[in-house]
Amino acid sequence: MLNNKKLFWAALIVLNSVALGILFSGYFIKADYSLGQKESSYFIGASYMTMNNEFYKIMNEEISAKVEAEGDRFILRDPALDADRQKEQIEEMLQKGIDVLVVTPVDWESLSLILKKAKAQGVRIIVVDTNVYDETLADSTITSDNYNAGMIVGKYFLEQCKEAELIIMTHEATKSGQDRVQGFIDALSGEEGIKIVRRIECEGQTEIAMPRLQEAIDEGVHFDNVFCLNDLASVGVVAALEDNHMLDQVGVYGVDASPDSKALIKENMIGASAAQFPSKIGRETADTIYGLLEGKETEKNILVPVELITPENVDEFGIDRWQ
């Protein structure tokens, strides 16, 4: 256990160093994948919520590999959780003449005007991982079943305890975060012994979740379980609890089943997580891009199923990689 904890802290230090590196290097990535470009090629642009999340890197690898294989052009922009920067980057891509926009909104309510402009220019719009407020603006929306992710974790949580004082770590600017939290809360409906004592906004980021939970601890908030909208938040929560010698007293539950969180599940430092499948989302997105470009009928809404990972089945999924 001690060696595993040392590895955990080393990984956390690296993770936070990477996060700070992104913050102080201009907040965004500019990538242009143009090798092997064919004549009369299509131009695909992508803007995810942040590239400070391995989930989006894996999803993007599936998409960019397909675009490169087709001989088309692909550009990536990273808004680094800045909604205004995301709008500016989409405007830049429209000026460059993209044919398809793949977007994960930083703020699900903020993109309506720029997406209307994109549609007016004939750009096909694919929304991934979380919804936009006006879903009529998207040609296709591809997400995990986020509500069910919260629901299955909530049901498992109830199997572990019927009385709890809960903190919920949120990201209110995203529909996916809202849906996961709502699914979890709905699973607890009617359980009088379960009390939500605080909701903490953490933007789904380790480096925000850790100090904000620390603030709640310092304020004397009494809690014995934490539900996190994603596992970047879960890792930050585990770090704060470990720092305060509280990890053996507090249960932690999340969504993602990232490699880090699966390692913590295996060590019984996280109770359970609903697994997302970024490779599947990426492949669905890549197929939808070319379906739209070829004029084929495509699905308006695609939900990628999630699965519950617990200490009992974590080895089936592997802890060294995303599923």
What are these regions (language model features)?
Residues 1-41, 116-121:
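Short, low-complexity disordered leader/linker segments with a strong preference
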Residues 8-13, 21-33, 187-188, 277-323:
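Hinge/cleft segment of the Venus flytrap/periplasmic-binding protein
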Residues 48, 63, 151-194, 198-199, ...:
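An alpha-beta-alpha
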Residues 55-72, 149-153, 176-194, 208, ...:
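Short, solvent-exposed amphipathic alpha-helices that sit
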Residues 100, 108-148, 159, 256-266, ...:
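Flexible loop/hinge segments that line or gate small-molecule binding clefts
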Residues 103-118, 184, 198, 203-262:
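Hydrophobic alpha-helical
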